[in-house]
From Swiss-Prot:
Cofactor(s) needed: NAD(+)
Protein name: Glycosyl hydrolase family 109 protein 1
Stretch forming the signal peptide: 1-16
Its membrane topology: Lipid-anchor
Keyword NAD applies: yes
Lineage top rank: taxon: Bacteria
Residues annotated for NAD(+) binding in this entry: 63-64, 85, 134-137, 154-155, 183, 240
Keyword Lipoprotein: yes
Organism, scientific name: Bacteroides fragilis (strain YCH46)
GO molecular function: hydrolase activity, acting on glycosyl bonds; nucleotide binding
Details of cofactor binding: Binds 1 NAD(+) per subunit. The NAD(+) cannot dissociate.
A cellular component annotation (GO) from this entry: plasma membrane
Keywords, comma-separated and alphabetical: Cell membrane, Glycosidase, Hydrolase, Lipoprotein, Membrane, NAD, Palmitate, Signal
EC number of the protein: 3.2.1.-
């Protein structure tokens, strides 16, 4: 009898422990949210006076800067006023781009680590376009806004929460646009799929996925002074999340009716980073910080989820892992572009072979083409042909720059604001915090400080 009683007591104790564990609520780790200074307002939907001509100064002419200069020579209503890089030869190379386009040379700034400040201080520049290494992005943008300039900053625009809040406060205080140059939101498949989602083709969007999966083994030597490998060596977490986050967040109307509440993240151990350093320098690295693979799961206020991955170390085909999971349909870009949806989501006369649509298989190629044609985004209808001629990651870079100029010239809200920048860049600090606390949930701040529901749904602005 006592045996049975002991077994019963043990069972009840285990049940009580298990029940207690299930009932426990783990409070996410929180980071400080600075109080908005008195008299300062949010910049959700910010508009500024129209600019007949957008006068531009470029800082950083290494890997991405020259391509931006080239693209701007094809954008109407722009004037390239100044060029800056630490290395004089790079400025000279960018001047040749202007000469080839039959444009006058721009003012040159180089040879000093503070030369960029003089560019920002000029009175004849409206927009400062920053394409330097990551660690200089935020400080340059803040200085430029403080001197009355709009700023466009390469990805990632900020690497820490302190930098993010400084950019937000400066944009709010100066009422200047602060846009991150996230090109992947203009990809042809992504933008068409966004249009489909906005028109209800997938039903309610419940889950999105994105990533930056790109083996950089052949590219590490091209980064000036090895800055990118050094950054991965010294920083843990998803340090380059914006290519995946941008399209994912636009699909879910983040800070335009929904907001991200918390994340959990984990990584693998570091293998290929230290191996690469050993191979190229002979040095042993025992404390390489960034794991080869980082995976992050996010939950929003409205119960949606986002999965983000980062991997620049292992052999894998390039992928941004773009996926859309809706209540009534699905889209995926990698490894192949495909759609899946209930037949009821599409009118029978809109696509061929409508009878072949089902909820468990990819639509046939002719149906996919019909969908891509029917839901081609208005931006692509206007710019696709020119974008593919000018180029820049297949044309999406040109569309990004064109839209930036278009909105400034028409006094419209930009396609991406400083809060988008914050939400996509905060992954670096917040994923590290989660990983270093055994993948604990970490709260994602409301960077709008209360304005996340002010606009209902993400949309691009167009002049009337």
């Amino acid at each position: 009898m006592f045996k049975h009683l002991n077994a019963l007591f043990i069972g009840l104790a285990l049940f009580a422990c298990t029940s207690g564990a299930v009932a426990q609520t783990i409070k996410p780790i929180e980071t400080p949210v600075p109080v908005r200074p008195a008299g300062q307002k949010d910049v959700v939907g910010l508009t500024t006076p129209k600019l007949d001509v957008v006068r531009v100064g470029f800082i950083g002419l290494g890997m991405r800067g020259p391509g931006a200069v080239e693209r701007f020579t094809h954008i109407p209503g722009t004037q390239i006023v100044a060029l800056c890089d630490l290395i004089p030869e790079r400025v000279a190379g960018a001047q040749k781009i202007l000469t080839k386009a039959n444009l006058p040379e721009a003012a040159s700034y180089s040879g000093s680590e503070d030369a960029w400040k003089k560019l920002c201080e000029r009175k004849d520049i409206d927009l400062v376009y920053i394409a330097t290494d990551w660690k200089h992005h935020a400080q340059m943008a803040i200085y430029a806004m403080e001197h009355g300039k709009h700023v466009a900053i390469e990805v990632p625009s900020a690497m820490t929460l302190d930098e993010i809040w400084a950019l937000i406060n400066t944009s709010e205080k100066t009422r200047k646009h602060c846009m991150q140059l996230e090109n992947c939101v203009y990809d042809f498949f992504e933008l068409t799929t966004l249009n489909m989602a906005q028109q209800g083709v997938f039903g309610e969007v419940l889950h999105t996925e994105g990533a930056y999966i790109h083996n950089l083994e052949d590219f590490w030597p091209y980064y000036w002074n090895n800055w990118r490998m050094d950054y991965n060596q010294n920083h843990r977490g998803d340090v380059y999340a914006t290519h995946g986050m941008g399209p994912a967040c636009q699909l879910l109307d983040i800070h335009r009716g929904d907001k991200m509440n918390y994340l959990v993240s984990m990584d693998t151990k570091a293998v290929n980073g230290p191996a690469y350093i050993k191979k190229t320098t002979g040095k042993e690295v025992k404390d390489f910080q960034n794991g080869d693979q980082t995976s992050t799961l996010i939950r929003t206020e409205k119960g949606k989820t986002i999965l983000i991955q980062h991997n620049v170390m292992t052999p894998r085909p390039y992928s941004r892992m773009y996926q859309v999971v809706g209540a009534d349909g699905y889209a995926s870009k990698y490894p192949i572009e495909e759609y899946c949806m209930r037949p009821t989501q599409i009118a029978s006369n809109d696509v061929p072979n409508h009878e072949k649509l089902n909820a468990h298989g990819s639509v046939p190629a002719d149906v996919k083409k019909a969908l891509m044609d029917k839901y081609k985004h208005p931006i692509h209808k206007e710019l696709e042909e020119t974008a593919k001629k000018v180029g820049g990651h297949g044309g999406m870079d040109y569309i990004m720059d064109y839209r930036l100029v278009y909105c400034l010239r028409n006094g419209l809200p930009l396609d991406m604001d400083v809060y988008d920048l914050a939400e996509w860049c905060c992954m670096a600090d917040l994923t590290k915090l989660s990983i270093e606390n055994s993948s604990a949930p970490v709260a994602i701040p409301d960077f709008t400080r209360g304005a996340w529901n002010k606009v209902k749904g993400y949309r691009h602005a167009f002049a009337k």
